[in-house]
């Protein structure tokens, strides 16, 4: 049974049991800022389990794309060297939100495994938590598993409820026992059942974990039963496929074998058992799906993890002898394997290929450059009789040049050496500490709120008269009262304030009554449907239960709405002008501008920018109404609505039709396109490989920008004594004149250098058969200095020369040495001798070198020392 069929049978089985099939969420978690990547099926349901995200269903099933690389859950270094570690994997799961519990969860699992997948019952073992008699009895008495194949696992991790068979969401919160199902590969494979000394062997393999969220644990460790008990299960598709396909390694299943063969093809390797091919096959899945979900290789956060995975794959290709790009060529093979299950992969195929190709090309340059630095450093260590490479240097290679530590370690091993990894770790820790110190956190992050959700009135109203204070926070802690002058976060039961979301900034405004005035500087989400008003109490005292008038800054909101609506029109126009591959990758919409990041691999031309502006302004002139509808997500997408990167959507979504644009959007917008007024793009540039950024302005901002631009054009025309319409022609004339004058000036400088060279030659002093000259050449630039040195070398035949010039407090130095003398006197060392005395440094070839300095006062003394320096070396 192929992996694709296994996935489909799982989802269809649970659908037949009343479960809603929920699409895989993004690998970038939308509901948990503490999590690097989505690493299990329950991540997208975390708020559902906590009761803060109501859904229209109580049973769900998913095939969730997951990544474990970076952060707490990091399998990267094991990938390719064990049978079951992956960076990317698919987690099959079924979930109950206060619906069924242990009986049905266990019964469903047994039926699917033994009836649908037809696994032999005698091959299945189960574990339960030591104290979970209920689960034990269900397995033994209802399902009929022999008691010798049911194993109780107690607290085996050194604390109460710390067990392989007891699951917790954190130190506090929902938790409960779990039961795990294992498959026995038979006595021909070494290993013992779970809980035995031989449990780490490969005979008994865990294939499914059923978690029963039964309790809530408080800060004191007390356990109370949850009013609504839930189920969260997870089964790795790759592990299950290995069992059903009768192989002992996940890399032997059909999906991986096809990718391994493809990796062998592009690296021109015939040995399909090579571990490097497994690494490459695994990594193409993780890298491709991360890029699909909007992650771009970078130097921090998720982008850095992606870059590390890409570079690890490239390094393994390099180890196989592949010296050119190859990794991006596997995207088409991955699409062939997984595109049917994940259409978003097929849609993004070209973009993923382009991003990987660019990253490869960049890193191959890094490998070549890094290897030269590393080889030089190792040669130096060997020359001194050492066996350990300095960890600080390894960190510099990693941090400055992107050279991975594991590659550095591999090269060292080949030379019989090691890396000082503790020193490397110390350097890395210092960098991380600096990064943490520089981090900023939103005022609402981490606030504990258990009340009702906020009712939002901001689509229709700019003020609400009877808003009640239901929560107050100062310095991250809940309080009953806020005093004048304190910064705080206020939660109301009703509000017209829009909380920052979907790229749109939060509203500003005022919360007030007769005795109190609270200035709202920002509005942020405390939870999905809970709005926090962050600001300062300017007057009075604010207490829980107070009733206030909540009023937004209507002028600021109107300007923000213009920019947000223009963003929708611009997004559509970009797709029309540049192509359907354009996909939003991020945005920031405030009262001043809209900033829009999108997938595209080339700078926009002036003509493309003009066409986008024209399309958007035509839509503005059409003055089309904005029409908002609420409908099921699937219906909206089928109807052509665009879902945007980084957004988490529920099952019911808000669809905005604005002119020719249709998008899912929860933000605030103009009533008609004409309200935008005028649209102008002011910035276009690149922010990462395959990602462009456009900034645009609207309304009075755009009009003011054009007026200021017009004024500058008129000023420039007046300065050049031309009409604005003649400006381009006049500038071309001036440029031609400047080029002609520069040519004349260069000729004059050359003549001057020649004449000065004749004079300077007479100042040279002979030392050991070599003429030594150190002098200042007034008014010369670097080019003139070089030409003069060349003429002097020709004239003097055997010479060591340093010429200097001073301009604007900066020293320029050129050193030249004739070939006969350069074995003993090197120009690079000579110029550095002078440069170090004038606050600079430099370098170059043995026969010609240059340097600069910032301390001209020491120049005469430095030049005077040249003769003695040369004499010492002859």
UniProtKB/Swiss-Prot annotation:
Keyword RNA-binding among record annotations: yes
Known function: Catalyzes the attachment of alanine to tRNA(Ala) in a two-step reaction: alanine is first activated by ATP to form Ala-AMP and then transferred to the acceptor end of tRNA(Ala). Also edits incorrectly charged Ser-tRNA(Ala) and Gly-tRNA(Ala) via its editing domain.
CDD domains in the record: AlaRS_core (cd00673)
Record-stated family: Belongs to the class-II aminoacyl-tRNA synthetase family.
Swiss-Prot/TrEMBL cofactor(s): Zn(2+)
GO terms for cellular component: cytosol
Catalysed reactions, semicolon-separated: tRNA(Ala) + L-alanine + ATP = L-alanyl-tRNA(Ala) + AMP + diphosphate
Sequence positions that bind Zn(2+): 564, 568, 665, 669
MF terms in GO: alanine-tRNA ligase activity; aminoacyl-tRNA deacylase activity; ATP binding; tRNA binding; zinc ion binding
Biological processes per GO annotation: alanyl-tRNA aminoacylation; negative regulation of DNA-templated transcription
Main location group: cytoplasm
Source species, domain of life: Bacteria
InterPro entries in UniProt: aa-tRNA-synth_II/BPL/LPL, Ala-tRNA-lgiase_IIc, Ala-tRNA-ligase_IIc_anticod-bd, Ala-tRNA-synth_IIc_core, Ala-tRNA-synth_IIc_N, Ala-tRNA_ligase, Ala_tRNA_ligase_euk/bac, DHHA1_dom
Protein name per its UniProtKB record: Alanine--tRNA ligase
Documented EC number(s): 6.1.1.7
Domain statement: Consists of three domains; the N-terminal catalytic domain, the editing domain and the C-terminal C-Ala domain. The editing domain removes incorrectly charged amino acids, while the C-Ala domain, along with tRNA(Ala), serves as a bridge to cooperatively bring together the editing and aminoacylation centers thus stimulating deacylation of misacylated tRNAs.
Gene: alaS
Top EC class for this record: ligase
Keyword field contains Heme: no
Subcellular location: Cytoplasm
Keywords recorded for this protein, A-Z: Aminoacyl-tRNA synthetase, ATP-binding, Cytoplasm, Ligase, Metal-binding, Nucleotide-binding, Protein biosynthesis, RNA-binding, tRNA-binding, Zinc
Species of provenance: Burkholderia ambifaria (strain MC40-6)
